[in-house]
Protein backbone atom coordinates (compact mmCIF):
# COMPACT_ATOMS: atom_id res chain seq x y z
CA UNK A 1 0.00 0.00 0.00
CA UNK A 2 2.86 2.36 0.87
CA UNK A 3 4.44 1.76 -2.56
CA UNK A 4 1.17 2.60 -4.34
CA UNK A 5 0.82 5.87 -2.41
CA UNK A 6 4.45 6.78 -3.10
CA UNK A 7 4.03 6.01 -6.79
CA UNK A 8 0.87 8.12 -6.93
CA UNK A 9 2.61 11.08 -5.28
CA UNK A 10 5.56 10.86 -7.67
CA UNK A 11 3.20 10.68 -10.66
CA UNK A 12 1.27 13.75 -9.48
CA UNK A 13 4.48 15.69 -8.96
CA UNK A 14 5.78 14.78 -12.42
CA UNK A 15 2.50 15.75 -14.08
CA UNK A 16 2.44 19.04 -12.19
CA UNK A 17 6.02 19.78 -13.24
CA UNK A 18 5.25 18.94 -16.89
CA UNK A 19 2.20 21.20 -16.85
CA UNK A 20 4.12 24.12 -15.36
CA UNK A 21 6.96 23.69 -17.86
CA UNK A 22 4.56 23.73 -20.80
CA UNK A 23 2.61 26.73 -19.58
CA UNK A 24 5.36 29.23 -20.41
CA UNK A 25 5.53 28.31 -24.10
CA UNK A 26 4.65 31.41 -26.07
CA UNK A 27 2.75 31.14 -29.28
CA UNK A 28 -0.23 32.19 -31.27
CA UNK A 29 -2.24 31.90 -34.43
CA UNK A 30 -0.46 33.81 -37.22
CA UNK A 31 -2.73 36.15 -39.15
CA UNK A 32 -2.47 38.00 -42.42
CA UNK A 33 -2.77 41.76 -42.91
CA UNK A 34 -6.57 41.47 -42.54
CA UNK A 35 -6.28 39.63 -39.19
CA UNK A 36 -7.45 36.39 -40.80
CA UNK A 37 -6.13 33.07 -39.45
CA UNK A 38 -4.83 30.23 -41.60
CA UNK A 39 -7.22 27.23 -41.56
CA UNK A 40 -5.82 23.87 -40.50
CA UNK A 41 -7.93 20.70 -40.57
CA UNK A 42 -6.05 17.74 -42.04
CA UNK A 43 -2.65 16.07 -41.88
CA UNK A 44 -1.62 17.92 -45.05
CA UNK A 45 -2.66 21.23 -43.46
CA UNK A 46 -0.64 20.37 -40.36
CA UNK A 47 2.48 19.74 -42.46
CA UNK A 48 1.91 23.04 -44.24
CA UNK A 49 1.35 24.79 -40.91
CA UNK A 50 4.61 23.42 -39.52
CA UNK A 51 6.54 24.66 -42.58
CA UNK A 52 4.74 28.01 -42.42
CA UNK A 53 5.66 28.50 -38.75
CA UNK A 54 9.30 27.70 -39.47
CA UNK A 55 9.32 30.38 -42.20
CA UNK A 56 7.96 32.81 -39.60
CA UNK A 57 10.86 31.85 -37.28
CA UNK A 58 8.66 29.84 -34.94
CA UNK A 59 9.76 26.45 -33.66
CA UNK A 60 6.68 24.28 -33.92
CA UNK A 61 3.46 24.49 -35.92
CA UNK A 62 0.31 22.37 -35.72
CA UNK A 63 -3.47 22.47 -36.08
CA UNK A 64 -5.27 23.80 -33.03
CA UNK A 65 -8.97 24.67 -33.00
CA UNK A 66 -9.09 24.33 -36.82
CA UNK A 67 -6.37 26.95 -37.29
CA UNK A 68 -2.60 26.97 -37.71
CA UNK A 69 -0.91 27.53 -34.35
CA UNK A 70 2.79 28.33 -33.95
CA UNK A 71 4.86 28.00 -30.80
CA UNK A 72 7.72 30.39 -30.04
CA UNK A 73 6.73 32.98 -32.64
CA UNK A 74 8.68 36.22 -32.48
CA UNK A 75 6.71 39.16 -31.12
CA UNK A 76 7.20 40.90 -34.46
CA UNK A 77 4.89 38.37 -36.16
CA UNK A 78 1.27 39.48 -36.22
CA UNK A 79 -0.71 36.85 -34.31
CA UNK A 80 -3.78 36.15 -32.23
CA UNK A 81 -3.09 34.59 -28.85
CA UNK A 82 -6.74 34.15 -27.84
CA UNK A 83 -8.52 31.64 -30.08
CA UNK A 84 -11.94 33.07 -29.15
CA UNK A 85 -11.30 36.11 -31.32
CA UNK A 86 -11.19 34.59 -34.82
CA UNK A 87 -12.97 36.92 -37.21
CA UNK A 88 -12.13 35.36 -40.54
CA UNK A 89 -10.17 32.60 -42.20
CA UNK A 90 -7.56 33.17 -44.89
CA UNK A 91 -7.73 30.89 -47.90
CA UNK A 92 -4.22 30.65 -49.38
CA UNK A 93 -1.11 30.18 -47.29
CA UNK A 94 0.83 33.22 -48.40
CA UNK A 95 3.70 34.73 -46.42
CA UNK A 96 3.33 38.00 -48.30
CA UNK A 97 0.01 38.61 -46.54
CA UNK A 98 1.45 38.22 -43.03
From Swiss-Prot:
It is found in: Secreted. Residues 1-22 form the signal peptide. Expressed by the venom gland. Has the structural arrangement of an alpha-helix connected to antiparallel beta-sheets by disulfide bonds (CS-alpha/beta). GO terms for cellular component: extracellular region. Keywords: Disulfide bond, Ion channel impairing toxin, Neurotoxin, Potassium channel impairing toxin, Secreted, Signal, Toxin, Voltage-gated potassium channel impairing toxin. Belongs to the long (4 C-C) scorpion toxin superfamily. Sodium channel inhibitor family. Probable sodium channel toxin. This is Probable sodium channel toxin Ts27. Disulfide bonds join 36-88, 40-63, 49-68, 53-70. It comes from the Eukaryota. One of its GO terms (molecular function) is sodium channel inhibitor activity.
